[in-house]
């Protein structure tokens, strides 16, 4: 399983290619040769459209580097190097403009279909184009599910319950309004308005109604009811440890790779012309102050 966090944790002084190469040397099985690992990195770079920036530094607060979308794709490449069957992403489009976000979702969709990999992502306020790229949707309100099924069927589902938009709007915007109880532009079943409830009570009533309808639907045998027999915890742990040992390099190889990565990352910082000038200037100033 791979997990891509919302904030990209990468070394700013390393290039995109160096980041993925060091990750490959650390995470890919020891039985693979160095050339095979480099070939795997080249394939990932091509798959994620990172060819143009492969020799560009990641960058950070004080280092100019790649764009936000390229940095996010590098983080994704870091995780899919080991070819996980399940990839989780925490709000991958946050902080990206609409064009970069759409390109990223297109790449994720291509990865899911070409490698038959399951990709699960949390996302806020996707555009209409992005929304229609999703296969399945899980909508959560106040920690409880109110819809789980095919993304293209969600509007019909809520319409059958009596919830329809009163103005043309993005399906994702409609769903988020439902989940948060923002019902100004949404028609709701009349029975929920009985007694002219206060706004807060009305929102709570609608959310509770949607949660109850989802539970009823799941209880009637909705999607995902068939379950595989679960392994015992001890068996799962032994299997995970065995798979980890099969994939890991030994501690000395890890030490060598980490040392090389640290030197490569810090050397560019320590040997920066501005830093050298500052160090020499401070040394000369202190030497003159204490000159006898």
Which role does the model predict for each range below?
Residues 116, 123-156:
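H-loop (His-switch) and adjacent beta-strand-loop-beta switch element
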């Amino acid at each position: 399983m791979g997990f891509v966090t919302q904030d990209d944790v990468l070394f700013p002084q390393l290039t995109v290619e160096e980041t993925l190469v060091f990750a490959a040397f650390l995470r890919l099985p020891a039985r693979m040769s160095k050339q095979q690992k480099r070939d795997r990195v080249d394939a990932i770079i091509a798959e994620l459209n990172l060819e143009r920036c492969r020799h560009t530094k990641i960058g950070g607060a004080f280092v100019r580097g790649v764009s936000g979308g390229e940095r996010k794709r590098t983080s994704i490449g870091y995780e899919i190097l080991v070819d996980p069957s399940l990839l989780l992403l925490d709000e991958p489009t946050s902080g990206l403009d609409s064009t970069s976000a759409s390109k990223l979702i297109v790449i994720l969709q291509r990865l899911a279909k070409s490698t038959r990999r399951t990709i699960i992502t949390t996302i806020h306020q996707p555009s209409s184009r992005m929304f229609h790229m999703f296969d399945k949707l899980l909508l959560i309100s106040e920690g409880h599910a109110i819809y789980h099924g095919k993304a293209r069927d969600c509007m019909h589902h809520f319409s059958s319950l009596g919830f329809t938009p009163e103005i043309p709007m993005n399906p994702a915007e409609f769903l988020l309004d439902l989940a948060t109880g923002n019902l100004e532009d949404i028609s709701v079943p009349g029975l929920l308005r009985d007694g002219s409830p206060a706004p807060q009570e009305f929102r709570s009533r609608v959310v509770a109604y949607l949660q109850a309808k989802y539970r009823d639907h799941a209880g009637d045998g909705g999607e995902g009811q068939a379950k595989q027999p679960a392994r015992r915890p001890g068996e799962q742990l032994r299997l995970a440890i065995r798979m980890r040992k099969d994939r890991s390099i030994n501690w000395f190889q890890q030490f060598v790779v980490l040392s090389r990565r640290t030197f490569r990352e810090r050397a560019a910082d320590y040997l920066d012309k501005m830093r050298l000038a500052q160090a020499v200037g401070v040394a000369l100033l202190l030497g003159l102050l204490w000159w006898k």
